[in-house]
From Swiss-Prot:
Domain EngB-type G: 22-194
HAMAP family the UniProt entry points to: GTPase_EngB
Protein name (record): Probable GTP-binding protein EngB
A GO biological process held by the record: division septum assembly
Lineage, highest ranks first: Bacteria, Thermotogati, Thermotogota, Thermotogae, Petrotogales
Length: 196
């Protein structure tokens, strides 16, 4: 898949504000500070998502219209401790409603920091997606910060840690070096049925 056009078309804080489900969409989820905004900028080819050094900056569901025919959906980062209980509850309700009602959702790309083993909330997200029957794949971000041997070892360790849930696609990725960019876009294209 080639991205030749991308624009932020909607920022959603309430489930009733979601755009109509008239296009296939792929969502991107991950812990706060996993590099989701940098990842989106890399795959979209333009600086469209705000990159922040403060984790948990994305507090809304952000809809990007890609090539005028697909939605790339940036979900709020999970696991950031310094937001209020009320805000966390709002996020939970929003996410729950989104996953349960969004029939145009083709798959979720779950971003995991390649440098670290998955945490409790990552496993909780996998269990949740499995229970809902939502297809998902793993993108291992910040791969450029590892040596070749560290990368290989952690790749296998992370894969093994999720193996009890089933067989999934795992792709190392670096927003800095663009490692994995072609593979990620190819996989997203296959999921969306786009052969460009």
């Amino acid at each position: 898949m080639k991205v030749y056009k991308a624009q932020l078309i909607k920022t959603v804080y309430k489930i009733e504000d979601l755009p109509p489900p008239d296009k296939k969409e792929i969502a991107f989820a991950g812990r706060s500070n996993v590099g989701k905004s940098s990842f989106l900028n890399a795959i979209l080819g333009i600086k469209i998502a705000k990159v922040s050094s403060t984790p948990g900056k994305t507090r809304s569901i952000n809809y990007y219209l890609v090539n005028d025919k697909y939605y790339f959906v940036d979900l709020p980062g999970y696991g950031f401790a310094s937001v209020s209980k009320q805000e966390k509850e709002r996020w939970n309700v929003l996410m729950n409603e989104y996953f349960k009602t969004r029939f145009s959702l083709s798959a979720v790309s779950l971003l995991i920091d390649h440098r670290h083993m998955p945490q409790k909330l990552d496993y909780a997200m996998v269990e949740w997606l499995k229970d809902l029957g939502t297809p998902f794949l793993f993108i291992l971000t910040k791969s450029d910060k590892l040596t070749k041997s560290e990368k290989a070892k952690l790749f296998e360790d992370i894969k093994r840690s999720f193996s009890t849930y089933g067989e999934y696609i795992y792709m190392p990725f670096s927003s800095k070096t663009k490692e994995g960019l072609k593979e990620v876009l190819k996989t997203i294209g296959e999921i969306l049925g786009d052969n460009d």
